[in-house]
Amino acid sequence: MSNSVPSSVRGKLTPDAPLAPLVWFKSGGTADWLFEPRDVADLQDFLAGLAPEVPVMALGLGSNLIVRDGGVPGVVIRLGKAFAKVAKVDEVTLDCGGGASGILVSSTARDNGIAGLEFLRSIPGTVGGFVRMNGGAYGREVKDVLVDCDVVIRSGEIVTLPLSELGYTYRHSNLTDGSIVVAARFRGHPGNPEAIQAEMDRISAAREASQPLRSKTGGSTFKNPDGGKAWELVDKAGCRGLQIGGAQVSEKHTNFLINTGTATSAEIEGLGEEVRRRVKASSGVDLEWEIKRIGRP
């Protein structure tokens, strides 16, 4: 496949790159190629020169993701420090790089007296990831605060898409495979930095109390069904603490799967499927994965 991948890049291009260290579950195989572009132009040039049949996907902080043990075909693109900047645009708007974390976005908003973005602190990922999936927490979603975003599409062209063109639904957008969110603008409203910090502290405490944050986990495993909570259905089906190999349903929060130490991705995904089977038998509900599963078994 090396002939299909441009070799003249300014960023870092790594063949057969281990992905387990880069994802929260700490499991899974390698990427055929891992590309960490120097800047937006480097990413554009790379995608423009990449054979069109080669699959492309973006990797942020590696939460919300199972990388299967057989590895990921094609190119995995990881946005580094050059894409992690956050800057104030006006009194209520921030311009955020696709590699910036939710914590950085919410903290910058606080420092500039911009309220309404506190919930982004609790999303364990980067701007590129939570813009793509309409990430949310504590009653708010990206669609509530997004103005527009810059996307490098598979051909290497960069386009700016307003909120109205993203087709947002619950944890979903219509962004095409292979398109990379490199920047986004978020709008809040004027607020007091101390009050903003207090709300961020409240959210942090709620997460700490209810979620297994010190574990190797992928975050929320299943989408909440209409009118219900995934964790309640998992609990009702008797899955709290259920284990397959090194993979376990968290005792603390049943919508979280954890790697207890040496789990394979096959064990983690298999546990998720067993939970889905038991919930279907118990409640008649087909739970839908929120965690993305990628690669070869």
Curated annotation (Swiss-Prot):
GO cellular component: cytosol
Principal place of residence: cytoplasm
Catalytic activity: UDP-N-acetyl-alpha-D-muramate + NADP(+) = UDP-N-acetyl-3-O-(1-carboxyvinyl)-alpha-D-glucosamine + NADPH + H(+)
Active site per the UniProt annotation: 171, 220 (proton donor), 290
Function: Cell wall formation.
UniProt record similarity statement: Belongs to the MurB family.
Cross-referenced PROSITE patterns: FAD_PCMH
EC class: oxidoreductase
Keywords of the record: Cell cycle, Cell division, Cell shape, Cell wall biogenesis/degradation, Cytoplasm, FAD, Flavoprotein, NADP, Oxidoreductase, Peptidoglycan synthesis
Pathway as given in its UniProt record: Cell wall biogenesis; peptidoglycan biosynthesis
Gene Ontology MF terms: FAD binding; UDP-N-acetylmuramate dehydrogenase activity
Listed cofactors: FAD
InterPro entries: FAD-bd_PCMH, FAD-bd_PCMH-like_sf, FAD-bd_PCMH_sub1, FAD-bd_PCMH_sub2, MurB, MurB_C, MurB_C_sf, Oxid_FAD_bind_N
EC number: 1.3.1.98
Annotated gene: murB
Cell compartments where the protein resides: Cytoplasm
Name of the protein described by the UniProt record: UDP-N-acetylenolpyruvoylglucosamine reductase
The FAD-binding PCMH-type domain, residue ranges: 26-191
UniProt source species: Novosphingobium aromaticivorans (strain ATCC 700278 / DSM 12444 / CCUG 56034 / CIP 105152 / NBRC 16084 / F199)
Pfam short name (any one): FAD_binding_4
